[in-house]
Amino acid sequence: MWQSTKNVYHAVSAFLAAFCYGFPGKKLKIIGITGTDGKTTTTHLIHHILNSAHKKVSLISSVYAQIAGVKYDTGFHVTSPNEWQVQKFLRQSLDSGDEYIVLEVTSHALDQHRMDWIDFEIGVLTNITHEHLDYHKSYANYVSTKEKLLNQARIGIVNCDDDSFSFLEANSKENQRITYGIKNNADITPEKFHFTSPLPGEYNLYNSLAAICACLQVGVSAEEIRQSLKTFKGIKGRFEKIAADVDFDIIIDFAHTPHAFEEVLPTAKKNTQGKLIHVFGSAALRDQSKRQLMGAISARFADLIVLTEEDYRTEDVNEIIDQIAKGCFAEGAKEYATNEYKLALKSTSPVFFRVPDRKSAIEFATQKLAHKDDTIILTGKAHEKSLCRGVIEYPWSEHLAVKNALKRS
């Protein structure tokens, strides 16, 4: 009942916002990107390609909004801003003479009507995996909500290798659908469209294919796309290797779902000569069923794991860690106290520690665990600028926490 009331509020608010700003979402060519994982990178990839092809384009993503070359903060823990912010940005984009805007879209924003009164030229769906089931209640509901973007768009672009594809195919509307993939017979594949990219991992191959599909549909030439993909260096907090004067690597990534772990951890492991050290937690008041899965996947790929906080809000951080630890144990990981780290380093099995304070966890990983040729990967916070404890948002920077930890090492 509460959720329905909230959705009605947003639906009315979305109309009022669109009306007040002159319905800019009906006058721009808007490319929307949704999906559980990969939507931020895909959003920025499309923007980079269009910009490199000299198109007048702006973007709104979970990292920032860039309207007419000016960057704006989109807030704490935000992927899709509220309807008033979105309409304001669209109006600024239109007034600046833009033809296109690339918009990252969440399932929450679609379900709550925050994207109403926006005509999407193209809707891109990256994948639909285990996430947000606390909100959507079932995978089928989650898929149906994501599909709203495809059905609102003139052209829908979908990943035919994803588990959601059979459902989407069975329920597709009359609009045009274009597919991309690696394993199945898609419209766009690496064999049909040859390209190179500095981005690591198979998951970024999928992100690139999605961007290729979208940009081909708006008239960017194949050669322009290929050249742009070569020059895209990635974005903040997405498998970002931190420059530091140490003999081990540090990577910051936003991965916070089981599927994302299955993508980024093997990629990090493949590029690590020594041990892979994984520092992570799980956000509170979200889908609890993913926590044990994340612990198991981490133990499958990481050698040393530091379980810590990630926006524990009004839950007990130690109970969240307990739930993650069950997955670690299930994969044969052994638990050690932090003062036993020297003994733990000799273990041939995966090892995990509990360090509830994230700052202390990063210090422990950098100062005690990491040695030559190791890799530390910090997941879950990335670009976010706050850490929620209780009901208070405390200022937080993953990058600054790493910098300060290295100063003391």
What are these regions (language model features)?
Residues M1-N7, C213-E223, Q227-G237, K241-S409:
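ATP-dependent carboxylate-amine ligase
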Residues W2-C160, S164-N175, C215-V218, N271-T272:
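Phosphate-binding loop of NTP-binding sites
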Residues K26-L28, S96, D119-I250, E340-K346, ...:
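Acidic, Mg2+-coordinating active-site environments of NTP-dependent enzymes
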Residues T40, N207, D253-T257:
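Short, conserved phosphate/pyrophosphate- and ester-handling motifs at nucleotide-, phospho-/glycolipid
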Residues H54, G69-V70, K192, D247, ...:
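Residue-level detection of beta-strand-connecting loop/turn positions
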Residues S61-Y64, K192, G380-A382:
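Short, small-residue-rich loop/turn micro-motifs
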Residues S80-Q87, V143, L205-S208, P258, ...:
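Amphipathic alpha-helical transducer elements in NTP-driven molecular machines
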